[in-house]
Amino acid sequence: MADAITVLTAIGITVLMLLMVISGTAMIVKELNPNDIFTMQSLKFNRAVTIFKYIGLFIYIPGTIILYATYIKSLLMKS
């Protein structure tokens, strides 16, 4: 059972990390000058970037805390 929990934890951390990277990239793209990039040329792309920006804003701090807590827990389990 411990192996299943470890695998699910690793999958969860990976998904959270990927979502944080995508959302962070969306925040960077959103903050750039719209005249210099292609963001405003596509309404669907702009909408997707906006959605990922809000997801990034809402999960950045809790996600970082969860990743840190999981890392500390794994260090304590090894000891």
Swiss-Prot record:
InterPro entries on file: Poxvirus_I5
Keyword annotations of the record: Late protein, Membrane, Transmembrane, Transmembrane helix, Viral envelope protein, Virion
Keyword set includes Electron transport: no
GO terms under cellular component: membrane; viral envelope; virion membrane
Membrane-related topology note: Multi-pass membrane protein
Primary localization class, coarse: virion
One Pfam family this sequence matches: Pox_I5
Induction (UniProt): Expressed in the intermediate phase of the viral replicative cycle.
Segments in the Intravirion topological domain: 1-3, 69-79
Stretches that traverse the bilayer: 4-24, 48-68
Localization terms from the record: Virion membrane
Virion surface side, ranges: 25-47
Protein function: Envelope protein.
Name of this chain's protein: Protein OPG081
Gene expressing this chain: OPG081
